[in-house]
Amino acid sequence: FADQVICFIDEPILSAFGSSTYVSVQRDDVVTLLAEMIEAIHADRAMAGIHCCGNTEWSILVDAGVDIVNFDAFEFGESIAIYPEAIQALFARDGMLAWGIVPTSAEIQQQSVETLAPRFETLMDQLASKGIDRQTIVNRAIITPSCGAGSMTPELAEMVFEITQGLSKT
């Protein structure tokens, strides 16, 4: 058994928040609905993470009380630095950023630990330039694939996880 259980919510539509299709959806409603799920997870003494593979208003997740923000850092890594106050608040309550820096698309064939490590360093530097302690960013980081690997061939999925493992050791 684990010392700490983590339950992830896969949020496939949050990236559409604010678009014309969902213009009537209010931010407070989104925060409230996510908070209800997070509170249920916390009630069972588990950590709550949310994965969003698109770009979104990341502060919504933090305001909802999530413990781990998991995002596609390969495609949208720069966007996290737009929300330094939210990330500070996440870190202040011992939350974590799960950086999906390893692509789960055909792009994986052009990537390696050697190509992704400098990219990840640059993204952390961008966030640190907003006033967040760099060592805190490192300490509160989890390295993950950008999204699920279920639609990939077994060979490419294996490559994703080998690179993820290698990158986590750098």
Describe each model-derived feature in a short phrase.
Residues 64-170:
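Catalytic-face loop-and-helix region of soluble metabolic enzyme cores
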Residues 1-84, 103, 111-113:
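Active-site loop segments of alpha/beta catalytic cores
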